[in-house]
């Protein structure tokens, strides 16, 4: 069990404390600083805010830049005060109206990614029309719908004087998440290094920046192999320092930076045994809780059972229970055969490592259940509610 410094205050503060998310900002900042310390000067961090947009404001203290992938994410940055100079405006779909707004409002500051020839044309034409030159990174495809084919990149670089509204600063690459070792990262980085060298020899293009998404593994489940973060980052740093490319490396990370700081707190609201199978019903379920890689509810996440006063329950023999949510679908099984200690109504279950994606990935509108409250926690400031519960029935009806 982790030390849940927030749980007593949550119980005292709210008559019905669940369901709720709690994000431990002290833990988040401590971890991000540790990551940057391990990397040293070999790379800078860029927070991919899609992992958890609620952490955008707090992340401003510990990361230099933010990857922003939609107009909605951009508006969040505006509201919390992220300077345009710290934004990498990414995303596979960019429409001219949005680009017109950003460029005319912020004067061409920030960095923009190019995901297609059309992207390049939109960005260039808008910048030229507004009398400015903007900085762009070209995303290299990893073989899916994202990014630009290498053959097209070669042509863009060769014809770069045809785009007077953009300054091509370098390349961006991201192929996926939850990579369990460094072998794929090594292959990708070596290929990018070679490609950058070819662009220089073929077209005299000197890349200044390589933005790379490593996709480090987060061990969500008890049977996952937990590697020492310092060792992993130390080995990764060696990979970076072995590259021929000596420009600035920016590491785009979301899940890896955010996952550990988050907790989902839910309560037991019903218990039953059906055909010799014991079931616990919780006041939250798959609409609130999503672990990447969970398969048929068979994998056991890190979760602690507490009594109504917030004390861990440890006495007596463990019993295996199926933990189910409040949705009217047989799919709402969070974990099968999870060990509990004499569960009772109103016992609290705290699921760990939900700082990334769960807060936005759930099927929130299904069955018009309310959205959970969201809290920030710090040792010095205690709990602060940053979003109250939201009734979703208003979004699921005509009036």
Where are these regions (language model features)?
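N-terminal capping/small domains of soluble enzymes
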Residues: 2-96, 339-358, 364, 386-387
